[in-house]
Swiss-Prot record:
<keyword id="KW-0963">Cytoplasm</keyword>
<dbReference type="InterPro" id="IPR011994">
    <property type="entry name" value="Cytidylate_kinase_dom"/>
</dbReference>
<feature type="binding site">
    <location>
        <begin position="7"/>
        <end position="15"/>
    </location>
    <ligand>
        <name>ATP</name>
    </ligand>
</feature>
<dbReference type="GO" id="GO:0006220">
    <property type="term" value="P:pyrimidine nucleotide metabolic process"/>
</dbReference>
<dbReference type="InterPro" id="IPR027417">
    <property type="entry name" value="P-loop_NTPase"/>
</dbReference>
<protein>
    <recommendedName>
        <fullName>Cytidylate kinase</fullName>
        <ecNumber>2.7.4.25</ecNumber>
    </recommendedName>
</protein>
<dbReference type="GO" id="GO:0036431">
    <property type="term" value="F:dCMP kinase activity"/>
</dbReference>
<dbReference type="Pfam" id="PF13189">
    <property type="entry name" value="Cytidylate_kin2"/>
</dbReference>
<dbReference type="InterPro" id="IPR011892">
    <property type="entry name" value="Cyt_kin_arch"/>
</dbReference>
<dbReference type="GO" id="GO:0005524">
    <property type="term" value="F:ATP binding"/>
</dbReference>
<keyword id="KW-0547">Nucleotide-binding</keyword>
<keyword id="KW-0418">Kinase</keyword>
<keyword id="KW-0808">Transferase</keyword>
<keyword id="KW-0067">ATP-binding</keyword>
<dbReference type="GO" id="GO:0005737">
    <property type="term" value="C:cytoplasm"/>
</dbReference>
<comment type="similarity">
    <text>Belongs to the cytidylate kinase family. Type 2 subfamily.</text>
</comment>
<dbReference type="GO" id="GO:0036430">
    <property type="term" value="F:CMP kinase activity"/>
</dbReference>
């Protein structure tokens, strides 16, 4: 079974991916973790590697390659904003493709708590990051991140919370 889970920062993708991984005994592969690993492999901080990635599309291509390679083995949760799109562009069809969404202020509060940051600073950083990623995804992949047409399930996580979202996905799997 292959499940993709995407969503903007603060929607709960990592929380839900971990819960599903534990429940169904699936590997959890996260594009963000791949990015962090690549930063370490290149002896760079996350910020240095982020700056490098903005100027070098090869970074995105390598993240994509690693995601596709992991998906070939099956039995995994593939988490990342573009996970569903990457598989689609590689003619791979997941068993279930999920997009989590949440109100921007809910996401901002979640991020500020997770990162131990002031809410205003977290909001500013979140909006800058999202604008940058939206532009990059359009330029590199010709993907509109707001196009949710490829997803089997779109869930409002600020309405349901982690347990509610998990229960909805469980019903979809059955």
């Amino acid at each position: 079974m292959i499940i993709t889970i995407g969503g903007l920062p603060g929607t709960g993708t990592t929380t839900i991916s971990k819960l599903l991984s534990e429940k169904y005994g699936l590997s959890h592969v996260c594009a963000g973790f791949i990015f962090r690993d690549m930063a370490k492999e290149n002896n760079m901080t996350l910020q240095e590697f982020s700056n490098y990635a903005e100027k070098n599309s090869g970074v995105d291509n390598e993240i994509d390659r690693r995601q596709v390679e992991a998906a070939k083995s099956g039995n995994l949760i593939l988490e990342g904003r573009l996970a569903g799109w990457i598989l689609k562009k590689n003619d791979m069809v997941p068993d279930l493709s999920i997009w989590l969404k949440a109100d921007p202020m809910v996401r901002c509060k979640r991020i500020s708590e997770r990162e131990h940051e002031n809410v205003d600073l977290a909001l500013e950083k979140m909006l800058l990051r999202e604008a940058s990623e939206k532009k990059r995804y359009k330029e590199i992949y010709n993907i509109e991140i707001d196009d949710l047409s490829i997803y089997d399930l779109v869930i409002e996580s600020s309405k349901w919370g982690a347990t509610g979202v998990f229960n909805i996905i469980e019903k979809a799997i059955k």
